[in-house]
Amino acid sequence: MSNRKYFGTDGIRGRVGDAPITPEFVLKLGWAAGKVLARHGSRKIIIGKDTRISGYMLESALEAGLAAAGLSASFTGPMPTPAIAYLTRAFRAEAGIVISASHNPFYDNGIKFFSIEGTKLPDDVEEAIEAEMEKELTCVDSAELGKASRIVDAAGRYIEFCKGTFPNELSLGTLKVVVDCAHGATYHIAPNVFRELGAQVIAMGCEPDGLNINEEVGATDVRALQARVLAEKADLGIAYDGDGDRVIMVDHEGNKVDGDQILYIIAREGLRQGQLRGGAVGTLMSNMGLELALKQLGIPFARAKVGDRYVLEMLQEKGWRIGAENSGHVILLDKTTTGDGIVASLQVVAAMVRNHMSLHDLCSGMKMFPQLLVNVRFTEGSGNPLENEHVKAVTAEVEAALGKRGRVLLRKSGTEPLIRVMVEGEHEDQVHEFAHRIAEAVKSV
């Protein structure tokens, strides 16, 4: 069991100005990471960020800490998280660092690391960084201080990488696409990718001001996108989250297409093209409809713990290549090393064009079970609600009522003080009743 103090399932995250997301902490983190990473020989780190106003402050603090440890930093400016993973590999940097809180509001921020391979740092490296944090900060000699530079063509490099994952023989010239960038890091990337591939692009959520990231736009709130798709009579809509590692889509009828459905489409297309290796990995939150639909196609399916790092770990264990969370993290190891919203959406659009099918029709082979997720906030330090006997008893009653045609999942968020209550079954009314019954039990603790 890990004893990590700061690193959660997706790096270090919190409210800006509150520990640990303070300038002092981030400077010390940069120094500690620099000391650990310098042991591997390289002296170059790539740093990117999303569009939050606090990114500039935290970027400066990180750079100061790295420089004090003797490591140089190359800055990309606002860039999607998967772009930093790609650029870290492309530049053979020792690590990449992203300053982002992904889908969270602007007042949150976080720090996430990528290894030289473009994957998230192993637990033992994160633990080594935390151990270094306990030491007194020292500065290398002036002649050995790290330097700062800017990668001026970072956006162009990543745009070309994304386009390179789309089949050369296909064109998007017939498609009208609404692209919602959540006022986040994809705002200057995604619309250009789709335009350069020939699509008619209607861009929204592309006016970041440092405060509006994820605000009623993007992958976590597709209502505006759904309305825009219908108003523009577009073929589809694509929504990314603030740092571009998630994607949710909308069909021409305004229906939401989530990560489970995206995984189904990509897996089925891989099977049709003879390119599917093994099976597909989802999570404990993946819809039962996905599992049943893949089973009908003869595609093996496995569930990992919630979190894209655990999806990746299971893919590596099994030697499979595709996995996703229903929240829209889609990992395609033949093309990327981490969840990449733009690359995933390109594979879905390629399936549409190749098969002359709408997004709605591509989803038709998978019947979604009604599923409800209720988030219940709890007070940290007051104990674990999941260990409460009343909560356990209510959960057991619901599981007995659902039988084999439904599921209950309770888990603590890895990034926020929340208990996530998920209930899934054949009947929507029953699912809602059971989910709220368990949620009330959690609230009563």
Curated annotation (Swiss-Prot):
Residues involved in Mg(2+) binding: 102, 241, 243, 245
Any GO CC annotation of this UniProt entry: cytosol
Enzymatic class: isomerase
Alphabetized UniProt keyword annotations: Isomerase, Magnesium, Metal-binding, Phosphoprotein
Cofactor: Mg(2+)
Modification Phosphoserine, positions: 102
GO biological process: carbohydrate metabolic process; peptidoglycan biosynthetic process; UDP-N-acetylglucosamine biosynthetic process
Keyword Manganese: no
Record InterPro entries: A-D-PHexomutase_a/b/a-I, A-D-PHexomutase_a/b/a-I/II/III, A-D-PHexomutase_a/b/a-II, A-D-PHexomutase_a/b/a-III, A-D-PHexomutase_C, A-D-PHexomutase_C_sf, A-D-PHexomutase_CS, Alpha-D-phosphohexomutase_SF
PROSITE patterns: PGM_PMM
Keyword GTP-binding assigned: no
Annotated family: Belongs to the phosphohexose mutase family.
Role played: Catalyzes the conversion of glucosamine-6-phosphate to glucosamine-1-phosphate.
Protein name per its UniProtKB record: Phosphoglucosamine mutase
Organism encoding this protein: Klebsiella pneumoniae subsp. pneumoniae (strain ATCC 700721 / MGH 78578)
Lineage: Bacteria, Pseudomonadati, Pseudomonadota, Gammaproteobacteria, Enterobacterales
